[in-house]
């Protein structure tokens, strides 16, 4: 079968009751942002007032909570993927999370643990990478930490201590 045969398949339409049940299950499985839920409903031909009504019901029944999503997302990305604050903020903004929820999510990252993780990332990268000279080393370590979303001033301070 060709890959394109699957891309033309349409998602089945949901009735209101099916949409509510399926989206509640979708939200109960893991925390979701409003954008993901909205996209899922639109995928199944739920639009306009019905879409807004379903989202409103999800919020009032605690199936959808933007702040809890943001906090969970930040904790998970920091602990599992060792992302820095900048990358986490950027991803939350892409998902249309409010500034208030992003600020709340940043409180989930302990300052001491944050510095420790950055230090460990730099040490591991230093062990596994070859460098031509000190300038090359500084550039590669800085680029790596920036790509993980860490702040430049913290990176420069850590590299300066090495």
Task: Tell me what each language-model feature is.
Residues 1-162:
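An alpha-helical, amphipathic repeat domain used for nucleic-acid recognition
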